[in-house]
Regions:
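FIC/Doc superfamily catalytic core
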Residues: 1-236, 240-298
Length: 298
């Protein structure tokens, strides 16, 4: 994406214009003020987690205002005719979708992901929990693909099917897999977003299903995704389940699912936060369209 082509010193300079003081910018990034001059001397020393924080702030302050334009329309990115029943084409695509949704949330390397999927054995430097997350994600998305695309069956979006999807994703990871959370959940990377109270989750999810189950355009699916993540019905795995629902709803509508991964991760978080805090979805809709277009080129 556009922000990936800009070097980090330039991003820091532009962000400093926004924050005014280096101490304020350092606090927003999550580092000490001394880190900023150190980075100017050695930009390569910026750790990946802080590169992500810088990218997210850059997207938030510069790209989001640029993308927040009503009245934009996009041609639907349809599922190519060459995809169904062509394993040589759709399997690499599924692997990219699966790794992407894991990469957004964890630091798992592509090598470890491939080893977990291909060998179905635990890599030496990977916890059993992360191993299950990788394997469950890939095979759950593969099941969705085979059900909707190969068998021509619609994935009926309901509370029960969403819970079943969560059980598949989180089996071997959490004891409460497949059940709504009974605790307050916090979204660590999104500011100003409050999740639904535990006692209100069933009612809010019932409302989500009523309003969003039949979403069939990329704009509707993007808005439904932000709404689902704001509810945050499960104790963990909400992002992966939310993106799996995006995939299912896109395939139901014969649309190509958007590809979210490390390349557009910062814009994904910035656009999601903007949609949930301000109720404005134009940047998120554009991101969905650009990510689906990129998936087609992949």
């Amino acid at each position: 994406m556009k922000y990936n082509e800009i070097d980090y010193i330039e991003k820091l300079d532009r962000l400093l214009e926004v924050y005014g003081m280096s101490a304020s910018l350092a606090e927003a990034i999550g580092v000490s003020r001394r880190s900023l001059p150190n980075w100017r001397d050695k930009p390569e020393s910026i750790k990946p987690e802080y590169r992500f924080n810088i990218d997210t702030l850059y997207c938030k302050h510069f790209l989001i205002p640029e993308w927040d334009k009503p009245g934009q329309s996009y041609a639907p990115v349809l599922l190519p005719d060459s995809f169904p029943n062509n394993e040589a084409i759709f399997m690499p695509f599924l692997r990219r979708l699966s790794y992407g949704t894991i990469e957004i949330e964890t630091g798992m390397s592509q090598e470890d992901f491939d080893l977990a999927i291909d060998a179905e054995r635990l890599p030496k430097n990977m916890s059993r929990e992360v191993f299950h997350e990788a394997v469950n994600t890939f095979f759950s998305l593969q099941w969705l693909w085979r059900k909707i695309v190969e068998r021509g069956e619609v994935f009926e979006v309901s509370e029960e099917s969403i819970k079943a999807l969560h059980a598949d994703f989180m089996r071997g990871v959490r004891e409460d897999a497949g059940f709504y959370s009974a605790k307050v959940r916090v979204m660590g990377r999104l500011e100003g977003v409050h999740t639904t109270l535990p006692e209100d989750i069933p009612e809010e999810m019932n409302r989500w299903v009523y309003k969003c189950a039949t979403a069939s355009t990329l704009a509707e699916i993007a808005e439904a995704h932000a709404y689902f993540i704001a509810i945050h019905p499960f104790g963990d795995g909400n992002g992966r389940i939310g993106r799996a629902l995006v995939m299912a709803q896109c395939l139901n509508a014969r649309l190509l699912p958007p590809l979210f991964d490390g390349e557009n991760r910062a814009m994904y978080y910035a656009a999601m936060e903007y949609a949930m805090v301000h109720g404005r979805h134009f940047p998120l809709i554009r991101l969905f369209h650009e990510s689906a277009t990129r998936a087609k080129r992949a």
